């Protein structure tokens, strides 16, 4: 901070090798804090995950310990055993998907339509949602019933790098009054902002980027080829990288 205060033409930008910018943006829009949400999965009786590999390295957090607590059948007062239900909707098989009670393979674009469909049903809105085949629609209606019946002990998790999808998932959890989403705790493991990173590329294209200083990162390796960061470094007057 002292460096940027002294040199007014310097900008400090953070980026994550695995971008969570969409979640950060959505959380800031919804709750006013640029941070990742945190979930208490030990409170969940019903989990609906759309592309969120939360038993892997999803958002840099470890959820497996909380998850397994409700995956062991527990006897209730009526003598019947109960455990949490987990539905995974995803395009490619993941660690999380392999542990789900039900796994529904679906393309990412269709998963976004599923989120919109669930939200429209819970909000009783009539906005346009693409049609689903009858078999899938029946499954989705049953999922919605389970979300509603479990109420505060249900949660929808979204793993898509898309602001709209993240906001819809947050809104669904608000409608459900989900206590699985922690209201007082957030994760600060990711801070990257894709928009600011894109601005560096634009500054370079406009000829207004004089130099770049990097610390502990390797953007040529970790950023998409479409950003062509290698070309950027080759054409600026000054570049330096501090590494361990």
Set out the residue ranges of the language-model regions.
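Cofactor-pocket helix-loop regions in the catalytic cores of large enzyme subunits
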Residues: 1-244
